[in-house]
């Protein structure tokens, strides 16, 4: 897939975006393997509640990743929490729709959220924490000029082993 910004758009999620397919992603271990979502059993009710809670937040923004041509929800990217005093935020993301994984959509979403962070919120830095075994996420961050800044040794219990969290950052 060529690097085309118009392939996707980001839009704040609302409860109408919560459907069986979205909940199915969150309950699919292969999709959420490298996220903390793997520890929860999700339902339409619980996901709608989460979306409502995020919409109330002033420092976190849960955005859906949608295909532009079909308006299909394929994943999420979250900006926040934002630290307005120090002008930085964290990001987290995933492509839930398996047939759209490994096509560069996550990279495009990160590029778009970087632009939002810089222009709309006047942030100076973004941070992303990654399980050390999550090679695709490391690649997508590095493609977007995030730099490995450090790690927290043996932070997570992952598939029976302790692994580290890698901390990536990008300055604007």
Identify the function of each model-found stretch.
Residues 52-64:
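A short helix-loop-beta-strand connector motif used in the catalytic cores of GNAT acetyltransferases and
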Residues 24-25:
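Conserved catalytic core of Hanks-type protein kinase domains
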Residues 30-51:
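Conserved GNAT-fold acetyl-CoA-binding loop/helix
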């Amino acid at each position: 897939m060529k690097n085309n910004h118009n392939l996707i758009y980001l839009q704040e999620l609302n409860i109408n975006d919560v459907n069986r397919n979205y909940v199915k992603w969150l309950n699919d271990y292969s999709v959420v393997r490298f996220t903390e979502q793997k520890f929860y059993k999700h339902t339409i009710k619980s996901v709608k509640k989460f979306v409502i809670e995020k919409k109330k937040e002033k420092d976190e923004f849960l955005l859906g990743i949608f295909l532009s041509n079909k308006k299909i929800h394929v994943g999420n990217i979250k900006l926040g929490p934002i630290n307005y005093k120090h002008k930085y935020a964290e990001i987290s993301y995933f492509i839930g729709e398996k047939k759209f994984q490994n096509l560069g959509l996550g990279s495009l979403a990160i590029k778009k959220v970087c632009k939002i962070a810089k222009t709309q919120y006047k942030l100076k830095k973004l941070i992303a924490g990654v399980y050390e075994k999550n090679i695709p996420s490391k690649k997508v961050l590095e493609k977007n000029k995030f730099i490995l800044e450090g790690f927290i040794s043996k932070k997570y219990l992952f598939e029976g082993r302790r692994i580290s969290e890698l901390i990536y950052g990008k300055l604007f």
